[in-house]
Amino acid sequence: MPFRAKQTDGREDGFTLVELLVVMAIIGVLMAIAVPSYIGFTARSADGTAKANLRATLPSVEAYYLDKGTYVGMTVAGLRASYDAGLAPGVAISGAPSATSYCVTDTEAGHAWSVLGPGTNSSSFKSNNSCS
């Protein structure tokens, strides 16, 4: 069987410039929708993790209060040592705890949350690491 050259009509098969531009425009629209949604999802995830870390800390904080009758002198290292608290690495005690109140903070992926405890078994979450 002899080799025969393929005859063409002068046009190559492929996509035109207009077709490629339309596909790029569609991809751009999809990215404009997907990227903000993804960023919002990751931010909500980080907030949820920070809140969960703080909730896990509160039983140790209240156990400290039950043992000592005050929050004064409470430290993260002391909570870890005395109450076997599985405290997350980002958890910190802000300021100096008083006899009746404390502030525990957690920063997860740049999102700061705080728990301000005005007394035994009562607390409130605040965003932006604000305990005041």
Predicted feature residues:
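N-terminal single-pass transmembrane signal-anchor helix
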Residues: R11-Y38
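N-terminal leader/signal peptides at the extreme start of proteins
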Residues: M1-F15
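Regular, well-ordered alpha-helical segments
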Residues: A32, G40-A43, P59, A63-L66
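Periplasmic/extracellular, small/polar-rich flexible segments of pilin-like filament-forming proteins
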Residues: P59-S132
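Conserved catalytic core of two-component sensor histidine kinases
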Residues: M24, K51, L58
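Aliphatic-rich helix starts adjacent to a transmembrane/signal segment
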Residues: S37-L54
